[in-house]
Each structure stands twice: as structure tokens, then as C-alpha cells.
């Protein structure tokens, strides 16, 4: 049995090797990733995922070869990105990118490599999170859910924070998130939100002004956006 320390050490070596080989993937697609007994032992029978965002164009330039190399390295699952709502295809966020892949082609290449698409990061292009725009967000998630169901994903994740200036904004965003969760749930897909750091900014109630507190040690006024999300979103959706 591989102990935890040995497993983490071997995975670290594998990760460093993967980073170093990114350029090799594009410049020399026939070169194989060196396999070691340590890596095989560390990953045998375990699931190990990769965000394809970390490879970007390097992977898109030769998907079949790149996916096969990931499988040989011990990866089993992928979290993809680059969903385009206008075409329903997948690419990356580089405006110069001209490579876009249809969902059925993406799935075939992943299946052929013996991998699985477990999750996807995607964000609506519409940035005005208002009550009036809720139907538009519903349409985005309905179309995206249909396409991602074809890929067999178990989770869809929004990784970006909409603009939130006050508590009312956070409540509207939370409701849009709830509706998105209801839509994906009908297809057997979990909906999630990937927070960063801006969610830990405090916001006031609409119309409320910040107080000038002479005590520098006094806690700032307002509620964390993250706290408002937790309070106003439904974990069952």
C-alpha cells in the first residue's frame, strides 16, 4: 500500500513533469511521457482530475495526442472549459483562437483516450444580473445543460463573480444561481459556483452609506457577499 506521504510526493513529481512537458506537447507530439513505477503505484485505482484550462491551446492543437498523454500520465477525469454559448462548441478564452470543437467530437476523443469529462467551467456572457434578465440566464443554462448532458458531465460550475454593489444585488444573483441549479438538476447535473476572493468583500444594504468609525479596530460595516450567497442560495438546487 502506498502511504499518504509517498503518494503526495509522487503526484508532485508527476505535476512538475506535466508542467515541464506542456511545450513539448506542441513541439514534439510523438514524444512519450516517461512512465515510472512510482507514478503507476501512486495512481493505480485512484481517480485523478485535471482542469484543461491549465493546458489551453497546447491541448487544443492536438487533442487526440494530448488526451492520450494525459491518460498515460495517470489522469482519469477532466474539468473542461471554453464553452461558447453562440455556437455550443468548446475552445478557449484567447480571442485569437480559431479552434472550436463540437460536443460530440469532444466526447469521442475523450472516450477514445479512456478519460471522462466530470465537470465544466462556464459563464454566461450577459453581465447584467437583474430580475428582468432572469429569463435570459435561464435560456443560457437550458441550452448549456442540454449540450453538457451529451458530454456526460456530473457538474457544471460558474467561475466568475457578477458585479455586486449591495445586498439586493447579491440576492438577485443568488436567485439566478438557484434557477440555474434547478435547470441542471433536471438533467441530473449538479450546479456549482467557484469563488475567488471578491466574495469576501462586505456590501451594505441598498441606499445605506458607510459609517466613519473613529475606532480603527472596529469591524467594518456590511455583510460578506459569500455570507449572502450562503444565506440566499438553496444547497438542494
Task: Give the label of every model feature segment.
Residues 1-15:
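N-terminal secretory signal peptides and thylakoid transit peptides that target proteins
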Residues 17-21:
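Hydrophobic h-region of N-terminal signal peptides that target proteins for export
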Residues 23-61, 69:
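C-terminal segment of N-terminal export signals and the immediately downstream linker at the start
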Residues 67, 170, 174-177, 223-227:
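Extracytoplasmic/secreted envelope proteins and their assembly/folding machinery
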Residues 69-75:
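A short, Lys/Arg-enriched amphipathic alpha-helix followed by its capping loop at the start of a domain
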Residues 72, 114, 150, 232-235:
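Alpha-helix termination/capping residues and helix-transition junctions
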Residues 76-190:
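Structural motif corresponding to the early beta-alpha repeats
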Residues 77, 182-237:
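Acidic/histidine-rich catalytic cores of soluble enzymes
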Amino acid at each position: 500500500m502506498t502511504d499518504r506521504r509517498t503518494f503526495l510526493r509522487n503526484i508532485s513529481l508527476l505535476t512538475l513533469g506535466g508542467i515541464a512537458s506542456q511545450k513539448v506537447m506542441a513541439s514534439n507530439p510523438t514524444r512519450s511521457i516517461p512512465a515510472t513505477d512510482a507514478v503507476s503505484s501512486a495512481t493505480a485505482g485512484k481517480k485523478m482530475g485535471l482542469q484543461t484550462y491549465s493546458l489551453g491551446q497546447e491541448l487544443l492543437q492536438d487533442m487526440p495526442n494530448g488526451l492520450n498523454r494525459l491518460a498515460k500520465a495517470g489522469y482519469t477525469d477532466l474539468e473542461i472549459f471554453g464553452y461558447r454559448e453562440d455556437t455550443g462548441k468548446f475552445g478557449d478564452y484567447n480571442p485569437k483562437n480559431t479552434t472550436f470543437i463540437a460536443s460530440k467530437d469532444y466526447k469521442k476523443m475523450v472516450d477514445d483516450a479512456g478519460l471522462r469529462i466530470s465537470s465544466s467551467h462556464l459563464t454566461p456572457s450577459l453581465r447584467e444580473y437583474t430580475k428582468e434578465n432572469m429569463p435570459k440566464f435561464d435560456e443560457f443554462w437550458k441550452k448549456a445543460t442540454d449540450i453538457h448532458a451529451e458530454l456526460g458531465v456530473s457538474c457544471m460550475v460558474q467561475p466568475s463573480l457578477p458585479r455586486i454593489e449591495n445586498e439586493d444585488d447579491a440576492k438577485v444573483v443568488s436567485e439566478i444561481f438557484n434557477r440555474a441549479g434547478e435547470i441542471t438538476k433536471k438533467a441530473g447535473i449538479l450546479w456549482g459556483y467557484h469563488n475567488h476572493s471578491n466574495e469576501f468583500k462586505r456590501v451594505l444594504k441598498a441606499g445605506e452609506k458607510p459609517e466613519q468609525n473613529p475606532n480603527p479596530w472596529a469591524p467594518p460595516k456590511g455583510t460578506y457577499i459569500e455570507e449572502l450567497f450562503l444565506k440566499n442560495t438553496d444547497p438542494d438546487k
